[in-house]
């Protein structure tokens, strides 16, 4: 894995992003989270999202943003990739986004949206930020990462209302580490009737349902997950659903849980003012039902 990672880094010519610091403040003590927030509020207006008792709809996205959104800049192109990513997520009103190739841009994107943000750390991209992350309109309460797969998977438990929680898991593969991730999350997969699971990302493989040989797609379907796009559009020839500029459907969103109904899924590959990635954005809208029977209620 180490040699493969170094080879990939060299081939893709990934280097630290060229960011400029406006101001630097130094404290002679460790400041707490409230002090951090108060300092941040001076520069950006933010409002905490108030949780409702029950949420009836949830919009989820999956997006590989291509090297942290560094390929278009104001100086060179007249527009900034990262701000375009923010613009699209905001326009689509997404509640949760599973991001890949986040690198040093994840916290920036989350801050611009006023969202919660979680990522991992890994040796290969320690100077650029980690590969995968999750941003969420709603509070992130728990983080799970399997040993030796920080580059491939991060799972977060999110409180989407006062009575509901979901697991959101962002992924990027080479298939070698998929079995480790799958086994690590088995208990969470089994408990999806109580806490639904969204498992999506860049699998770098075409699903078996589309004529590909992805071991991940087969395993996920066997586990009871639903492929959001292919389930809604079963005709592969009529609706190929490509998620990459080379006409491949290598990004997918799988979901599992009794209280979930996928009411709409689309793949966004263009944008009027310019599209910022070589991977396309998957957007799915879910209707949520909550009852004692389906287990989505966490109220004590």
Identify what each model region corresponds to.
Residues 1-23:
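Extracellular glycan-interaction patches encoded by glycine-rich segments
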Residues 24, 31-87, 129, 133-300:
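Active-site regions of metal-assisted phosphoester/phosphodiester hydrolases
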Residues 85-98:
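Proline-aspartate-enriched helix->loop->beta-strand connector
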Residues 96, 114-121, 144, 149:
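Short phosphate/oxyanion-binding micro-motifs
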Residues 102-107:
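Acidic helix-start/capping segments at beta-turn-to-alpha-helix junctions
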Residues 117-132:
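A short, structured active-site edge motif that brings together acidic residues
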